[in-house]
Amino acid sequence: ALKEEFEEHAEKAKTLPENTSSENKLTLYGLYKQATVGNV
């Protein structure tokens, strides 16, 4: 349920529009790492 939803959204994030700002990409990456690795 939750894990499948997370995986689905993680896949969608790989196809972001070209005009997505670096700041937004870094935010998404940080959230992804926090969800998969935890706080570092």
From Swiss-Prot:
<dbReference type="GO" id="GO:0000062">
    <property type="term" value="F:fatty-acyl-CoA binding"/>
</dbReference>
<dbReference type="GO" id="GO:0006631">
    <property type="term" value="P:fatty acid metabolic process"/>
</dbReference>
<dbReference type="GO" id="GO:0005737">
    <property type="term" value="C:cytoplasm"/>
</dbReference>
<dbReference type="InterPro" id="IPR014352">
    <property type="entry name" value="FERM/acyl-CoA-bd_prot_sf"/>
</dbReference>
<comment type="function">
    <text>Binds medium- and long-chain acyl-CoA esters with very high affinity and may function as an intracellular carrier of acyl-CoA esters.</text>
</comment>
<dbReference type="Pfam" id="PF00887">
    <property type="entry name" value="ACBP"/>
</dbReference>
<protein>
    <recommendedName>
        <fullName>Acyl-CoA-binding protein 2</fullName>
    </recommendedName>
</protein>
<dbReference type="InterPro" id="IPR000582">
    <property type="entry name" value="Acyl-CoA-binding_protein"/>
</dbReference>
<dbReference type="InterPro" id="IPR035984">
    <property type="entry name" value="Acyl-CoA-binding_sf"/>
</dbReference>
<keyword id="KW-0963">Cytoplasm</keyword>
<keyword id="KW-0446">Lipid-binding</keyword>
<feature type="region of interest" description="Disordered">
    <location>
        <begin position="1"/>
        <end position="25"/>
    </location>
</feature>
<feature type="compositionally biased region" description="Basic and acidic residues">
    <location>
        <begin position="1"/>
        <end position="15"/>
    </location>
</feature>
<keyword id="KW-0813">Transport</keyword>
<dbReference type="InterPro" id="IPR022408">
    <property type="entry name" value="Acyl-CoA-binding_prot_CS"/>
</dbReference>
<feature type="domain" description="ACB">
    <location>
        <begin position="2"/>
        <end position="40"/>
    </location>
</feature>
<comment type="similarity">
    <text>Belongs to the ACBP family.</text>
</comment>
